[in-house]
């Protein structure tokens, strides 16, 4: 397993050494980082799968136990479940890599689907599944158990490789086997981050704006193409988290998204030529989602939201209803 320059391993190793020089991290810094990543990873991982809770709403649900009007019970459970699973990951991360066993993976998956699909939580699938909109053919359910046994044998055999290589490969293989009916992507990202944390690396933070490149890079590799694009995304996600750690050690508040990169709804309207009323209507219909909300209540959008607005208009010109457009734009579980 040699990924070479695609993962920029030397740079990641140097950043790890720099971080090690600051260890043990001051308790208040460590606590702040863990709480920040708890919300950020929960928000981003769920958003990658179509959850419409914003970053601020995710924090309200996870930290305060409150509900958000207009959001489904499943979306609330996805937030609280992922946060609970991530807390479990932080607890397990203190154990050696060799202790990763099947029961840990199944327990994490059970936590992800708790209250959402209890019948399948923590269990391998027994039926065929497909990735919506993808040409990838997933393993026959009768072969899942054998594939997973091989997966864990290979995971142990990778012990001498670079931790970021191991984490990326574990994530890739798990979503490719697709052992569960639902929750494969979230569980794979938890496993990837568990491996990183066990080895002293920060978790990989895959941004919501990287969703399409992330999904396309996985599909490309699964169809027999190069893993280069996928590995670059994972590498940059780890580098991004290193920057957040160093930011916190420098006395700054962790921040994955620079507000200057985001658009207020008025800016988005000007950029796209749409009215505020239209954009707000699309938000209510679940077609358009803010990336964040300021303390003053201003909704902020990723620059890529302009492309989504254009796509909505294109689908409307094809005479699709709003419900059909929402379905077309809906997230594809990986």
Role assignments for model-derived ranges:
Residues 1-182, 186-290, 294-299, 317, ...:
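FIC/Doc superfamily catalytic core
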Residues 303-322:
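Terminal helix-turn-helix DNA-binding modules in bacterial transcription factors
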